Design a protein with these regions (language model features):
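Mature catalytic core of soluble alpha/beta enzymes
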Residues: 1-248
Length: 248
């Protein structure tokens, strides 16, 4: 599972969760990373006994930091609905969930360009939708010419490679946050299968070469502002085609 909240000790080892002044500026020792990866902590190691959780793996530590923002947004939307508010947008650090409309028109959402900054594209959001982005520019440090970012691949223990940015559209914000993290790790080769397995139908991925990969749903909704961007569209599957199904 590419979204794995059980790798809290790996997250701690990299130290991105602390304040910037305390954040490490060099990668952890390779031996320490490999030792944690070798034990493969996962959610399957947890047994639930009433209100108690038991972990069968000594290297298991839960860290829900990747989805905390999404969960907070979902709680805020639920509270607004309880108050009778049916048109709203809740935004935390650029990740958001919108319900209803902006007084009639959809909510315009700007997507950041990870290469050089600025605005990459505009999305129109309405109804009940969340837009979440995961990128290598959000938390990182550079050591000996190589940039290390905060999205840790549980399979290797190192920052995910091959992807600069992922943006997903999903209904609930918690699911969108988990999907953005998982697709960032999946990379250009596995993002379609991962999105389908997680029930996400609208995705955009920018690979390490700056190329934009989009599924048909996202391509039909997005307004790209960078006219020179190289786009790699994904064709719609033919009826009955299950070639992108997980395990195929």
């Amino acid at each position: 599972n590419l979204f794995n909240p059980a790798i809290g000790r790996l997250i701690d080892l990299w130290g991105f969760q602390v304040g910037e002044s305390e954040r490490r500026r060099v990668p952890p020792e390779r031996a320490k990373i490999e030792a944690l990866v070798k034990t493969r902590p996962s959610m399957d190691d947890i047994q639930i006994d009433g209100i108690l959780l038991h972990g069968g793996n000594p290297d298991l530590k839960l860290d829900f930091g990747y989805i905390a923002r999404g969960y907070a947004i979902d709680l805020a939307i639920d509270r607004l609905r309880d108050l009778g508010i049916h048109n709203a947008l809740v935004n935390i650090g650029g990740d958001l969930r919108a319900i209803g409309t902006r007084g009639g028109p959809p909510w315009p959402v700007a997507l950041r360009n990870p290469i050089g900054g600025g605005v990459l594209a505009i999305l129109q959001v309405s109804g009940d939708e969340s837009v979440f982005t995961s990128g290598d520019y959000q938390l990182n440090f550079t050591y000996k010419g190589k940039t290390y970012h905060h999205v840790i691949d549980p399979r290797t223990g190192w920052p995910a490679e091959g992807t600069r940015l992922v943006t997903v559209i999903h209904q609930d914000a918690t699911g969108a946050a988990a999907a953005a993290n998982a697709l960032m790790i999946a990379g250009p080769d596995l993002w379609q299968q991962t999105a389908q397995a997680m029930g996400v139908r609208s995705c955009l991925l920018i690979d390490a070469l700056g190329r934009i990969h989009m599924d048909p749903s996202m391509a039909g909704r997005i307004e790209l502002l960078d006219r020179n961007a190289e786009i790699i569209p994904i064709p719609s599957p033919a009826p009955g085609d299950d070639s992108l199904s997980p395990g195929s």
